[in-house]
A protein has these predicted regions:
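Glycine-aromatic micro-motifs
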Residues: 1-122
Length: 122
């Protein structure tokens, strides 16, 4: 599972990862727009073939039970489970911007990560 928000190491929701092992610190392929939705949470938007940004995150080996029972129930309504392309071309489950979600959001793609956004907002 590719995490790019508060569940990353050091984040407020990292406890939700439990004992799942960290597989890699990596980025997505450069095909995403990265948003701060209502200033509260990050969201990846796939631009497809259009040029986007590579977004920082962490990949964890989480069980489906962990996803179903612990991580996913706490996710905001503006996100849905999807698959993202990582820098090495492989795919990973991740939370992405829900199709049709219209909440106010700010494009933070140039920052390439949620931590950088939070540091700049503090």
């Amino acid at each position: 599972m590719f995490l790019n928000g508060t569940a990353m190491s050091g984040g407020a929701d990292h406890h939700l990862v439990g004992d799942a092992p960290l597989v890699a610190r990596t980025t997505t392929a450069p095909r995403y727009r990265f948003h701060a939705v209502e200033g509260r949470y990050p969201a990846l938007e796939d631009l497809g073939a259009a040029a986007g940004a590579a977004i920082e995150g962490e990949v964890y080996d989480m069980t489906y039970a962990q996803l179903r029972e612990v991580l996913l129930p706490g996710e905001p309504d503006g996100l849905e489970l999807g698959v993202v392309e990582l820098a090495d071309g492989s795919g990973s489950l991740a939370m992405v911007l829900r199709t049709g979600h219209e909440a106010p959001r700010t494009d933070i793609s140039a920052l390439a990560g949620w931590r950088a956004y939070q540091e700049g907002s503090a």
